[in-house]
Structure formats: structure tokens, C-alpha cells
């Protein structure tokens, strides 16, 4: 994997690149608070067949940070800008949570850009869920603001996250990748790459407009969900897949929102099946 840089709205954004230039194109978009490198196992495995690029969204990984955004279109625009930078007229894409929701919003803008989408529990809230967040706030934003931002070292961070109850179901390699790509060394020790304020602002931003554009998504789309999703409304998922006979909604038994970190082998199998 090689790390690259490009400019987006005055920000320096980073992405990981792997695979042959003359193979089919594949874009990967990560979840809120994480980074492209958390999906290193997908990048490495799929680079045998694809030219893979995985973006660090602004404020994540090695990309420059900002609080200067007002909705999630900021993130879908970054994905489209990266494909423009790469000269990709058409590609397939994998997204998780924020990354999945941002890819779907990007497909609303330009569905011809994408051949296939495989999105894991994408954040696509219903009208009522959006209204709740607007009125009462998102509980996840409160969790993000309270997140510990600094550590004495990356080694200490690895010990903490390896034992943390929230990571109990994660594979060991996934925890190691999180510390490698989402925590950076500083002169004082180590800190989160994604500042709690950025993560919280992302969780707090909801809007209705994209729900009126779901019919624009015409490309083959596979929505991979846990038995019960808290972030992707059933009717939204159905509306997304209704315009392409190859599209589908796939519920994975005994899985959760963080499946790509809890079962990497199964995640790769699912991706390989649908791409």
C-alpha cells in the first residue's frame, strides 16, 4: 500500500492506494472516527484484482482536519473529488457506516460513476430518526465528546483498546489496525487522529434532503445489515435497491454494526460475493 495526498476545498486529504493501474477500480470509504487503514485486510486482498483506493475522510487518519462542514454532503463530495483526481470515470465501491451513507449520497449525485456498491450498515436514517436527532441530539455525539483523546504512547493505547469492553467482540488484528491508523504519536505521547469534536459533529448532523433523492440510485447496490439496524431504516433500504434487479438487502445473522472489525474473514467473503 502507498499513501497519497490530494487537495479538496483547501484541505490536504490522504488516501491509501494498492493494486495495478490497469485493473478494475475500487473505492473504499470508512466509518466515522476510523480511517482507511482499518480496512487494510480488504485493501490487500482486493488489490490482487482491483486498483484500490481508500480515502481518509477530512478529520480522520492522515487527512487534514476541519469543523467547517454542515452536512454529510461534505463527505460524499470528497469521494467524488477523489475519483475525479484519479481520473476514474467508473468504479465499484465499499462503504461502512458513514462511508456507506456517503457513497449512497454520492450515487444520488452521479450513479453512473459507480458500477457496484457494497455498503455495510450505511447510515441512512428515516424521517422520524432525523427529526429525533434534530430535536434531542444524537446519543452517539455525547459518547464521542467524552472519548479519551490522548495517551502516554501508542503502546498504552493498544493495551487500553485491547481490554476495552466496546472492543470485546473485535478481532485482535482489527484493534491493532485501529491503533496503527487512528492514533498518531505526538511529542507528548499519542492522540486520536479524529478529534472528539469532529466525530461528534458528524454524528450530530442530519438532514432530510437526501431522502427525496433515493430514486436516483440506479446502480447495483448491496446493503449488508445486521438482523436489526439502528442506523439504516428498512423502508430507506428498500427504496434504494428497488431500481436495479441485481441489487439486494442482505441481513447477516449474529452480526452487528461493526462487522468489518468483528469478522474480517466473513466481511471479505461478502465483498467478494457481491463485487
Residue ranges and their predicted role:
Residues 255-264, 268:
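Catalytic histidine-centered segment of alpha/beta-hydrolase-like enzymes
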Residues 148-205:
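Conserved alpha/beta-hydrolase catalytic His-Asp/Glu region
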Residues 88-132:
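Conserved hydrolase catalytic core segment
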